[in-house]
């Protein structure tokens, strides 16, 4: 039997955190709640009002919204009552708490979507980094906990070089019955190594994606490349992405599954301590990512802060023999606490205190062949 830890192929896994999306305008987790409270569209919406009233009643939020709890505190508070199926009080029965939990998740999605602005700085850095990766004589895999796809949207420049992204999910996009009435803009080529000289970069989005619409009835995910679904702030309904023909006319809405007509949900794992990985698609991604890590010679972290709620990520690496791995952490803001978390999974980590956009030129020097 081949020991995957002893294979000779140079496999490099890059683990991307929020820091790589920050340059594109995506708020880091510690900024999301403040952004929610300062966003006028959210603040004056029905669901925004429900959520902020909940914070005032249970976390003492003041009028200036400058005494905010953490995201994890809010989710943990809600999870306590929901998991026990208990009311908080007469004002907040468990059914209302479940609704607030959903509203909070929807607001996080909305903030990430509306705050994104990919300027030249992000475009140039992303394109340059992708080109650097494909020039390596390595098998590249990317693992990320980010919901957004700012970094991956810049990959389209590599299609002409026969590169494809493989998200390791059997997307509904691959099946005619799902795509029969869907505009070709949402077609997604199935990544198969070697077909028409195709070269594959594997991607594992462990916390899901804002581009993934999930049908819980048929257990299929529709991938919406270069389009981001969003929620109606008044009623919580998933906004239906419009597809337009050459005349600019709306011809299709796909917020419901084309096959069984059930409502789609965005497939993400919220930043809560009590993460639910019962979804078979995300569970499968987790174990596929574990296999890639075991095969890797290089593991490069970029902009990942190792938040306390990501205990499952620590567990992921604790299941890997890190002894012979070349492990590098690239982060603009490295403090002792963050270093301690990394050293708990590997005692020979190399720390590079540098911003993502400034590390690209010397990136190859971080790798072992």
Per-range role (PLM):
Residues 1-24, 29-40, 46, 53-55, ...:
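SIR2/sirtuin-family catalytic core signature
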Residues 1-153, 159-163, 360-362:
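Gly/serine-rich nucleotide phosphate-binding loop at the start of the catalytic core
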Residues 54-94, 133-269:
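Extended, H/D-rich, highly charged conserved domains that either
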Residues 87-94, 110-118, 248-255, 276-281, ...:
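Phosphate-binding glycine-rich loops and adjacent basic patches that engage nucleotide phosphates
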Residues 91, 99, 226-253, 291-294, ...:
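Repeat-unit-sized solenoid/scaffold elements
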Residues 101, 105-115, 257-272:
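Active-site-proximal helix-loop elements at catalytic-domain edges
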Residues 113-115, 173-179, 271-273, 299-303:
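N-terminal start-of-chain detector that recognizes signal peptides
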Residues 119-128, 181-190, 238-242, 274-290:
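A Trp-anchored, charged/polar loop motif used as the substrate-binding/catalytic surface
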């Amino acid at each position: 039997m081949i020991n995957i830890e002893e294979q000779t192929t140079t496999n490099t896994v890059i683990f991307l955190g929020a820091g790589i999306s920050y340059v594109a305008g995506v708020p880091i987790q510690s900024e999301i709640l403040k952004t929610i409270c300062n966003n006028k569209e959210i603040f004056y919406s029905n669901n925004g009002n429900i959520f902020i009233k909940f914070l005032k009643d249970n976390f003492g939020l003041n009028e200036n919204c400058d005494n905010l709890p953490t995201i994890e505190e809010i989710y943990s508070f809600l999870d306590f009552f929901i998991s026990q199926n208990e009311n908080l009080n007469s004002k907040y029965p468990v059914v209302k708490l479940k609704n607030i939990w959903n509203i909070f998740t929807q607001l996080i999605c909305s903030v990430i979507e509306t705050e994104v602005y990919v300027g030249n700085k992000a475009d140039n850095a992303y394109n340059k980094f992708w080109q650097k990766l494909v020039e390596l004589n390595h098998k590249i895999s990317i693992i990320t906990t980010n919901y957004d796809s700012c970094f991956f949207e810049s990959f389209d420049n590599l299609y002409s070089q026969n590169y494809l992204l493989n998200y390791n999910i059997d997307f509904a996009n691959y099946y005619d019955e799902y795509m029969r009435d869907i505009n070709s803009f949402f077609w997604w080529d199935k990544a198969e190594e070697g077909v028409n000289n195709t070269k594959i970069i594997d991607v594992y989005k462990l916390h899901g994606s804002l581009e993934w619409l999930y049908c819980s009835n048929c257990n299929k995910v529709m991938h919406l490349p270069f389009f981001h679904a969003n929620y109606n702030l008044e009623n919580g309904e998933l906004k239906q992405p419009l597809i337009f023909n050459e005349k600019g006319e709306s011809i299709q809405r796909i917020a419901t599954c084309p096959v069984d007509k059930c409502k789609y949900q965005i497939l993400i794992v919220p930043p809560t301590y009590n993460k639910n990985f019962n979804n078979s698609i995300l569970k499968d991604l987790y174990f596929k990512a574990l296999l890639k890590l075991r095969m890797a010679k290089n593991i490069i972290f970029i902009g990942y802060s190792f938040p306390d709620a990501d205990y499952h990520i620590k567990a992921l690496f604790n299941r890997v023999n890190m002894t012979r791995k070349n492990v590098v952490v690239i982060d603009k803001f490295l403090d002792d606490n963050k270093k301690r978390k990394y050293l708990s999974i590997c005692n020979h980590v190399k720390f590079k205190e540098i911003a993502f956009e400034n590390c690209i030129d010397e990136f190859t020097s971080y790798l072992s062949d």
